[in-house]
């Protein structure tokens, strides 16, 4: 288990507020995953396998002695490494958006499919029973950018993202 410090330059980037006219280059920068390695933090413990943990998880780490609780920020099952940070407001735990590759999008109706370059505002949730959040969707050739009005905690690969307009489910994907 590797702790990631909030003192890294990575977490000193400004948090941007979005409307539907922000540049697509900025979107690609903010929805890119960051790679961590052991040089970014320090080894603080051992675990039984990175595949047993999920982003945002707090319980089950069996590591204490920190001012704030530790949360899982990222896992790497190839190297069996878990990256953690202190506090639920850690810079890597809360994200303004996400990117969904084109092959992972599953449109419920073909007439709702967005064209390349098209953008639309819906309400979205990324976990069961989460309140609906305003989101701006930008369709690009390689996939879909979702930029939320509010930061989203622990966006995790494999989650559902569903969006709605007027309480009607428009799109769902994994």
Predicted segments with their positions:
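AMP-forming adenylation/ATP pyrophosphatase catalytic core
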Residues: 1-174
């Amino acid at each position: 288990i590797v702790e990631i410090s909030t003192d890294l330059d990575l977490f000193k980037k400004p948090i941007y507020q979005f409307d539907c006219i922000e540049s697509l280059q900025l979107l690609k920068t903010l929805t890119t995953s960051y790679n961590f390695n052991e040089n970014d933090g320090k080894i603080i413990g051992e675990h039984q396998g990175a595949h047993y943990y999920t982003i945002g998880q707090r319980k089950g780490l069996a590591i204490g002695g920190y001012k704030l609780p530790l949360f899982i920020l990222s896992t790497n099952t190839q190297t069996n490494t878990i990256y953690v940070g202190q506090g639920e407001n850690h810079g890597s735990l809360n994200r303004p958006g996400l990117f969904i590759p084109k092959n992972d999008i599953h449109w419920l109706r073909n007439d709702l499919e967005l064209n390349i370059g098209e953008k639309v505002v819906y309400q979205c949730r990324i976990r069961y029973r989460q309140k609906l959040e305003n989101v701006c969707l930008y369709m690009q050739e390689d996939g879909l950018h979702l930029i939320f009005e509010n930061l989203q905690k622990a966006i995790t690969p494999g989650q559902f993202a569903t969006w709605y307009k007027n309480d009607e489910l428009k799109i769902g994907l994994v």
